[in-house]
């Protein structure tokens, strides 16, 4: 299969669609991101890399990290993990307090903010330096030793994370 041609066809079909997404402007540092950046990268099973558009552009992975941290913790906890966080879908917003209250403080799944906060707590339990462990995990998985965390984005998240603080306090209660 000609993956490069396939990616180019997808890219050309999608790039001119109306941009209906929304930048996460509630996080000041992310509000600065150019919404017109668009790239696709694919690595096939033999390690060949195919790219189109802004695929070389660095970006903040944000909630993609939830998948990666969940994989790390599932490897440590196995099915015991599901006693702390569920694995059911949710029709509510990713940062909903209502869902958490309805579920009596047990997040519905690890991909909601409340669930990812439980996963972060488990990262603290399992690793002396969880941020360093996570970064090394991502570097190894991606075969890219240049991946870095972004201090400006982290600080921006911290300064605007009031809802996440509320979620943590609700879980603790």
Predicted feature residues:
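N-terminal short leaders/motifs
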Residues: 1-2, 69
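Active-site-adjacent helix/loop patches that line small-molecule binding or acyl-intermediate pockets
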Residues: 2-14, 18-19, 75, 79, ...
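A short, well-structured edge-of-sheet supersecondary motif
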Residues: 15-52
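A short, structure-level motif marking secondary-structure boundaries and short turns
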Residues: 28, 54-55, 152-153
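Glycine/charged-rich beta-loop-alpha catalytic/anionic-binding loops adjacent to active sites
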Residues: 48-56, 96-103
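Active-site nucleophile and cofactor-binding loops and adjacent substrate-binding regions
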Residues: 56-65, 110
């Amino acid at each position: 299969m000609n993956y490069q041609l396939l990616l180019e066809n997808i890219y050309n079909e999608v790039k001119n669609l109306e941009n209906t997404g929304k930048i996460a402007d509630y996080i000041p540092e992310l509000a600065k991101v150019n919404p017109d950046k668009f790239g696709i990268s694919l690595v096939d099973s033999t390690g060949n890399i195919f790219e189109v558009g802004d695929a070389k552009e660095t970006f903040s992975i944000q909630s993609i990290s939830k998948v990666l941290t969940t994989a790390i913790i599932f490897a440590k906890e196995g099915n015991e993990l599901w006693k702390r966080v569920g694995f059911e879908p949710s029709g509510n917003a990713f940062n909903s307090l209502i869902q958490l209250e309805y579920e009596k403080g047990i997040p519905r799944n690890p991909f909601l903010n409340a669930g990812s906060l439980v996963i972060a707590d488990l990262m603290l339990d399992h690793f002396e330096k969880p941020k360093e462990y996570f970064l090394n995990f991502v570097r190894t998985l991606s075969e890219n030793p240049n991946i870095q965390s972004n201090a400006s984005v982290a600080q921006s998240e911290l300064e605007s994370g009031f809802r996440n603080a509320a979620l943590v306090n609700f879980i603790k209660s």
